[in-house]
Amino acid sequence: MRRLDGARKSGGAGLAGAGAAPHDVYTLPAGLPVPEDDGGADHLVGLELPSLVLESSLGDVNVRDFDVIYIYPQSGRPGVPLLPGWDETPGARGCTPQSCAFRDIHGELAALGVRVAGLSAQSLEDQLEFAERNAMPFPVVSDPERRLGEALRLPTFEIAGLTLYKRLTLVAEDARIVKVFYPVFPPDANAGDVLAWLRAR
């Protein structure tokens, strides 16, 4: 199994001076297992995004209204222990670095007319806290019943009694999926990869 060599760190609001603590949600530690393509997203290109209204950090949103939806397992909070086995689960770690990377290039995506949203199965309370702490300029969507996953048959995994989304990013054009990034690794590089793909079109 391939692993990430060398710790990677993404900036976060209010993180100035923080070190690579064991539960530093802004850091990707060295040695993370690299997820493999299990074919769980092979069917997605060509599908239409459903007309599905969900709660988000910026109010109710319809997933059809977005051009890029990055879907992630579960963001952490500083000082809160990770779920047992989180770092050993391929693709689990890195939700905050991924989100912060999308935040940091949001202006460039907006200049291309691209509307972005992040989405996980976490509660609205979790998404509101996360969005405020990290100054997210776009909606962070709450899908605790995994309704988008049911509509599109999105890949999931089980950990600590929870069913969570596997990390993937959907790019849509007129609400039809034209590109899927899956698996996504390292997570903090995904935003730049998406931007490069969009600019090359």
Predicted regions, residues:
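Chalcogenol-based redox active-site neighborhoods
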Residues: 2-201
